[in-house]
Amino acid sequence: MKEIVVFNGSPRMDGNTVTILDLVAQGARDNRAKVSFYTLFKMKFMACQSCFACRMQEDCVINDELREALQKVKTADAVVIGSPIYMMQMTGPVKNLYDRFFPLMDVDGRPRFGAKKVLTVYSQSIDDVHTYDSYYEYTAAMYPSFGFEWAGNIVCPNANDPESADRDAELKIRAYEAGKALALGTAGA
C-alpha cells in the first residue's frame, strides 16, 4: 500500500486548491493508498530557525504540530503540496513547510530518505495556466535534494471564482487521475 502525504496551503477550506487536493486524495484512496491530509493554516508550527540541529540528527528539533507530518514525509511514497498563488508565489505557510523539509537532506545536500514523487497543485487568478511556469520550475529545483521526483503540476486558473475547479470537468478528472497514478506508482513515468 502506497503512503501519500497531502499538504493544503490555502486559508480557504472550501476553495479551488482544496477541491483539487481532495480529488487527488480520492483518486489515491480509491486505489488503495493511505492518505494523510494536513491543512497548514489550521496548524500551529514555527518556521525553520536555521539552528542546524538537523545536521547532527535526522529530525527537526522543533516540537510543534508539523512534526508528525514531517515524520510521515520521511517514509511516504509521495507528497502532494497545494497552494494558491498570492503575490506571484506560494503562500507563506507553504514556504515555511519547504524550509522545514531541510532535514530531508544530508549535510552534502543529498536525500536522506530515498526517492518519492511530489505533485504540486496551484490555483491562480490569471487565466493562462503557464503564467507562473518559471516560478514552478524554480521551486522544483530544490526537490532532488529532498529526494522528490517532480510528477508535475495541476494548475487551476481563474481562481478568483471560488468554484472554478469544481466547474472544470477536465481539471477534476486530471486531479483524480493524478492521485490514482501516485497510488499505483505510475506518476511522472
List the model feature ranges, each with a label.
Residues K2-A33:
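N-terminal beta1-alpha1 ligand-phosphate binding loop
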Residues G9, D30, A140-A189:
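Glycine-rich phosphate/pyrophosphate-binding loop and the adjoining helix
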Residues V18-D22, D133-Y136, K172:
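Short amphipathic alpha-helical segment that frequently serves as the phosphate-/nucleotide-binding helix
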Residues A33-M43:
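A short beta-strand-loop structural module common to alpha/beta enzyme folds
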Residues K34-S36, D59, E149-G152:
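Conserved beta-strand segments of alpha/beta enzyme cores
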Residues M43-L70:
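Cysteine-cluster motifs in flexible loop/terminal segments that predominantly coordinate metals
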Residues V61-P144:
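Helix-loop-strand module that forms the ligand-binding subsite of alpha/beta enzymes
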